Amino acid sequence: MNILYYDCFSGISGDMNLAAMIDLGVSPDFLITELAKLGMEDEFSLKISQDSRKGIFGTRVDVELAHQHEHHHDHGHHHHGHGHHHDHTHDHHHHHEHRNLKDIEELINSSDLNDKVKATSLAIFKRVAKAEAKIHGSTIYEVHFHEVGATDSIVDIVGAAICFHELEIDQVWCSSIELGGGFVNCAHGKMPVPAPATSEILAGLPTTQGAVQQETTTPTGAAILAEFINNFSDSPRMTVLKTAYGIGHRDNEIPNVLRVQLANIEQQVSSLPTVPSRLLQCNIDDMTGEMLGAALDQLMEDGAMDVHFTSIVMKKNRPATTLSLLCSAEDEDKFKRLIFKHTSTLGIKSIAIEKTVLDISFDKLETPLGTVTMKNAILDGEVIRSKPELEDCRALAKQHGIPLSEVYLQIGKVREI
């Protein structure tokens, strides 16, 4: 399996990601041609050059805005930190239009980009929109994009999607993401690093802080990673095929570079079939045994893989019951609704799991009492055990007026012959 491994020891910004993709082998001409499909060529030009930080050479990308050629990208200029999209800090001012999410959707959907690139680009923008909306108590279509709605950030995000699909890798892996430290100026004033949007986008993902007193991961970079990453590991076992460096604009105490590696991971292929599943759980302390039993029957009838109860003791020493339901990943929403409908719970925990299953087959066994269906468990093509179907055994016990245990005994004798 070929992967991209993002080594974010110095964080990530949108321009550094584009630079790393070009350094990895994406054709600059191809990228520029694809970006032209947005119809924004009168707003920007892409400057691609070679640069170095702390002796590490790589590719640098500058998105030069058509009306701002006088805005120089000097390494020492205090407005050009790794801090924000193209290493601009939050307080730089662009005079071009700051589009909102609806504007961006119309721009991308009306372009000639392929559908995969469109979908990925919009997914990244929606991650930013959701973060901004939560922070500002708004909706994704009402919230005002600041830097992320600017031309250079649109180029960063759509460019990232173009490069991702051009490389055709199997998965994207990532190290812990360095966020930096200190404070940064943004549209709402001076904010601690990470910026609120960055923090919201990366919620639940492994990060580090304090390598430098600058913003090292921007909202754009964070959203790109959050959309692409399949797995996090600081020390993956992999065979590196190629290493690329995207050069940042500021010269920090540590190399201001984004290292991205094309690598191969040996997959341990299991011959055992697995099923992506969900374990849904809730605790109930105000339903009778009869009501719980009826709920279990209903959930099983509706197609749950398994349902069981566990006795627990809750707060104030109240006896209660944990309902655990196993279902397929695609049926998660269906069974959450059924649990809410048929029980008194107000909340459900969902755990993503992978269920490993054996192949099964069925055959008929003739006994002195009658025919019984046998279920066979198969491992590596061989039957490792068999058991009679309960309902057949119950029917024979009732038919002959004998205990169920006697039916099982007779089946056992036949199988010994």
Curated annotation (Swiss-Prot):
The keyword Protein biosynthesis does not apply. GO terms for molecular function: lyase activity; nickel cation binding. Keywords: Nickel. Residues 74-99 have a biased composition (Basic residues). InterPro entries: Ni_insertion. Residues 69-99 are annotated as: Disordered. It comes from the Bacteria. The keyword Zinc-finger does not apply. NCBIfam families: nickel pincer cofactor biosynthesis protein LarC. Belongs to the LarC family. This is Putative nickel insertion protein.
